[in-house]
């Protein structure tokens, strides 16, 4: 789990890949609920556009919080199991505290910004902001974990910046960033773990 007591290395590839699958599923659900096709049946159900927007906002906020909790738990518990399989202790020591702090600050700032935008009805750049701040969080914490997290962080950052310039397809960018890139990272970690 620890590499010279300065790096947390017990990140489970299966857990990371599972997070990617959950993100793709969430993007699909969001597209079916809020996309062009989904808007029809929601409009029939709610009729009034202000009621529809209030419903969309509630579903988006609750769904996002639930997804973050499930994905975070998946990575946490799968990494704890991996550390135990390697015969290492999974402790909240100084390295883990630095990792969590460096990851949490940009992630929390981006999350609060996204929540404020959604609650004010400004949905346009929400997916971009999520990708950008998540990328910054990974870049900020990769010094205390596996260096490949920095690569993922730069990829998320670039994808988020590209998403800023595309008025449509926000869920596609979101699905690629949080879904496909996590699946690829998970597969990389699985192969790397099997070779060592």
Spans of features found by a protein language model:
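Membrane-interface module
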Residues: 1-4, 10-32, 169-196
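Membrane-water interface of alpha-helical transmembrane segments
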Residues: 6-13, 58, 97, 121-128, ...
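Selected alpha-helical membrane-embedding segments in polytopic membrane proteins
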Residues: 6-107
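Hydrophobic alpha-helical transmembrane segments of polytopic
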Residues: 12-23, 63-68, 103, 127-130, ...
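Helical transmembrane-bundle signal
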Residues: 20-30, 68-72, 107, 111, ...
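Transmembrane helix-loop junctions in multipass membrane proteins, especially transporters and channels
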Residues: 31, 35-39, 80-88, 118-122, ...
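Membrane-proximal helix-loop-helix units in multi-pass membrane proteins
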Residues: 88-149
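Terminal transmembrane helical module of multi-pass membrane proteins
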Residues: 134-196
């Amino acid at each position: 789990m620890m590499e010279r007591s300065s790096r947390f290395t017990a990140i489970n590839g299966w857990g990371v890949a599972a997070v990617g699958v959950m993100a793709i599923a969430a993007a699909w659900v969001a597209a079916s609920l809020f996309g062009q096709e989904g808007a029809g049946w929601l409009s029939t159900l709610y009729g009034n556009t202000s009621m529809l927007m209030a419903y969309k906002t509630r579903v988006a906020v609750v769904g996002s919080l639930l997804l973050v909790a499930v994905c975070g738990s998946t990575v946490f518990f799968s990494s704890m199991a991996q550390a135990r399989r390697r015969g290492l202790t999974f402790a909240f020591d100084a390295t883990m505290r630095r990792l969590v702090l460096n990851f949490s600050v940009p992630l929390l700032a981006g999350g609060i910004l996204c929540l404020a935008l959604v609650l004010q009805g400004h949905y346009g750049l929400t997916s971009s902001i999520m990708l950008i701040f998540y990328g910054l969080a990974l870049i900020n914490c990769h010094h205390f974990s596996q260096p490949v997290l920095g690569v993922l962080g730069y990829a998320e950052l670039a994808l988020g910046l590209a998403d800023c310039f595309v008025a449509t397809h926000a869920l596609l960018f979101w699905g690629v960033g949080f879904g496909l890139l996590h699946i690829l990272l998970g597969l990389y970690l699985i192969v790397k773990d099997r070779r060592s």
